[in-house]
Amino acid sequence: MHRYALKVEYNGAPFVGWQRQKEHPTIQGAIERALGKIAPGPHTIAAAGRTDAGVHAIAQVAHCDLERDWDPFRLSEALNYHLKPAPIAITACTAVDAEWHARFSARQRQYLFRILCRRAPATHQKGLVWQVKQKLDVTAMREAAALLIGQHDFTTFRSTICQAESPVKTLDRLDVNEVDTPYGREIHFDVRARSFLHNQVRSFVGTLERVGAGSSTPQDVARALALRDRAACGPVCPPHGLYLAHVVYDRPPFEAERSI
């Protein structure tokens, strides 16, 4: 068998998430069906992150195993042909050794969340950002975000249906940045960790948005973290501003990343 790493970009709006489901459209299901068009199946692919319904990806990483020795460029071209018209694209493909695993070899996952601050309805960016009508206090949001960095029990910031064995995670980065775009002022959250709890990033952003709006304070966030109580979390923000932006490996599979 030959193993191939795939870099995958997608708009998550039409899907109930990454993970295959029998009766609902998923990204994993679409890619496995495309593989079935070019090679005998069944096929099961693995991914670095199992994104939820409505969540997008700039650079999800997956791998597949095929009996035939494919040229990576031809494999990506064939998959992209059979994925149409779904909003999924294979943007890079490379052969990897059998020990390399898209999920278990990953050292860090990096997420981007976009908030668009403007009163007029979003048009071009609709479904790609979380739009809020008021200005947000970025300084206060940064102060609150800094309190979440490091190793903590994140019970407050995980879904009640989270299946992780432990709520303890190490958050490597939670940067809050203002960005001027042609569509208006955006606030970008750069969130990085080896792994995340279910709904953790969206819980962070929803809580920090309330700080930016003046409804709560950085001290409230510190208390919520210490309480280890889901009821102390702010509102979970919608999924459509969230992107899996990058996955870090000790041995980056894609040529362009090996010098980073």
UniProtKB/Swiss-Prot annotation:
EC number assigned by the record: 5.4.99.12
UniProt: substrate binding residues: 111
SUPFAM superfamilies found in the cross-reference section: Pseudouridine synthase (SSF55120)
GO biological process, one term: tRNA pseudouridine synthesis
UniProt GO MF annotations: RNA binding; tRNA pseudouridine(38-40) synthase activity
Keyword terms, alphabetized: Isomerase, tRNA processing
Pfam families per UniProt: PseudoU_synth_1
InterPro entries for this protein: PsdUridine_synth_cat_dom_sf, PsdUridine_synth_TruA, PsdUridine_synth_TruA_a/b_dom, PsdUridine_synth_TruA_C, TruA/RsuA/RluB/E/F_N
Keyword Metal-binding: no
Residue numbers annotated as active site: 52
Keyword match Protease: no
Known catalytic reactions: uridine(38/39/40) in tRNA = pseudouridine(38/39/40) in tRNA
Function statement: Formation of pseudouridine at positions 38, 39 and 40 in the anticodon stem and loop of transfer RNAs.
Assembly: Homodimer.
Family: Belongs to the tRNA pseudouridine synthase TruA family.
Protein name per its UniProtKB record: tRNA pseudouridine synthase A
